[in-house]
Curated annotation (Swiss-Prot):
Domain of life: Bacteria
The protein, known as: Flagellar P-ring protein
Species lineage: Bacteria, Pseudomonadati, Pseudomonadota, Gammaproteobacteria, Alteromonadales
Family per similarity comment: Belongs to the FlgI family.
InterPro entries per UniProt: Flag_FlgI
Keyword Signal: yes
Species whose genome carries this gene: Pseudoalteromonas atlantica (strain T6c / ATCC BAA-1087)
Entry's Gene Ontology BP terms: bacterial-type flagellum-dependent cell motility
Length: 370
């Protein structure tokens, strides 16, 4: 019964009820308005002996000192257990301007035990084009904790080698945007669907007073993912136009019948439109249990024999009772789960049954294994 309730609960959460309108901004994004990934390499200093002595960390440390006019003899090997080499990455949201700040994540790339208590020195964050878009620096917040004893025993909570700096990067260069380059905007659906694209275009035309029959069209579906919308050229008018447009509500097309299985976690999500063709199923399990026991044999107290330890293997074979159940045409989600649950099938068994039904062509829906 727990399996039935769990699957029905998850399905009710993720499946949008039929007839529920949603805003355009929740289902689509404007083409060209996107975040950009930034990455950099730097040094964290001030660690309480939890740093590292990796060759690349030492080389980076020498380079940093050289930039400050300090030269170390090549024969000297500095002890830098309070320094760690790190990778720094951040997301640069659209339209942010120089002088604004963004959060950064700092991750150890060497053998550092922890970044707690460290400070990131000035690190250039570059984009895919190799240009510097932001500079990161500051003290980190590390949620993880680690401690190690002299005998090698240690305890680690969460991840002490990853930290975060809120507003830790200062933007130095804005990313060019194509928001004003054309006489139109392109809306990209988060989940491409031809029916939804047409409904979206029809909704925009209707709400903005377009008349496709007379050749006056504002929104045109391009493909399953994109809808092109005519927009004002003036900056102020375009912003106001998009602010109004993204709050229009419409009813997207029903999602295709789909079953998603995560074989690693045992999670199964079944869409409400999944149906079954007539099919009969039997599913049973053969369980083999092997256990090892050690038996000690003591010699006679007056004898000259030795104590002998022998291994004893116990093999137990259990064949579960199998039951066959039959599906009539058009069986729904509720009936499918209830029937499988009544025969005592675990989530792993349900996965095997669904895969077998798909192979047999009796499953009217797409089976996705992730």
């Amino acid at each position: 019964m727990k399996l039935l309730l769990f699957i029905l609960m998850i399905s009710s959460i993720i499946i949008v009820p039929v007839g529920q309108a949603q805003r355009i901004k929740d289902l689509a994004s404007v083409q060209g308005v996107r975040s950009n990934q930034l990455v950099g390499y730097g040094l964290v200093v001030g660690l309480p002996g939890t740093g590292e002595q990796s060759p690349f960390t030492e080389q980076s440390f020498r380079t940093m000192l050289s930039n400050f006019g300090i030269s170390l003899d090549s024969s000297l090997k500095p002890k830098i257990k309070n320094v760690a080499a790190v990778a720094v990455h951040a997301e640069l949201p659209p339209f942010l301007k120089p002088g604004q700040t963004i959060d950064v994540t700092v991750s150890s790339v060497g053998e550092a035990a922890s970044l707690r208590g460290g400070t990131l020195l000035q690190t250039f964050l570059k984009g895919l084009d190799g240009k510097v878009y932001a500079v990161a620096q500051g003290s980190m917040v590390v949620s993880g904790f680690g401690a190690e004893g002299a005998d090698g025993s240690k305890i680690v909570a969460n991840t002490p080698t990853v930290g975060r700096i809120a507003n830790g990067a200062l933007i130095e260069r804005a990313v060019p945007s194509g928001f004003m380059q054309n006489d139109f905007l392109t809306l990209n659906l988060n989940y491409p669907d031809f029916s939804t694209a047409k409904i979206l275009a029809d909704t925009i035309n209707q709400r903005l007073g377009a008349d496709p029959d007379k050749g006056y069209v504002i929104a045109t579906p391009i493909d399953a993912a994109s809808v092109r919308v005519s927009a004002p050229r003036d900056v102020g008018q375009r912003v106001g136009f998009l602010a109004t447009l993204e709050n229009f509500e419409f009813m997207p097309a029903k999602a295709p019948a789909r079953i998603v299985i995560n074989s690693r976690t045992g999670t199964i999500v079944i869409g409400q439109d999944v149906r079954l063709l007539p099919a009969a199923i039997t599913h049973g399990g053969l369980t083999v249990t092997i256990s090892e026991n050690q038996q000690v044999t003591q010699p006679n107290p007056l004898g000259q024999g030795d104590t002998v330890v022998t291994d004893q293997s116990i093999i137990d074979v259990n064949l579960d009772d199998t039951r066959m159940f039959k599906f009539d045409p058009g069986v729904t989600l509720d009936q499918l789960v209830r029937a499988v649950n009544e025969v005592g099938a675990a989530p792993g068994d349900l996965m095997a049954i669904l895969e077998a039904l798909s192979e047999a062509g009796a499953l009217q829906g797409e089976l996705v294994v992730i």
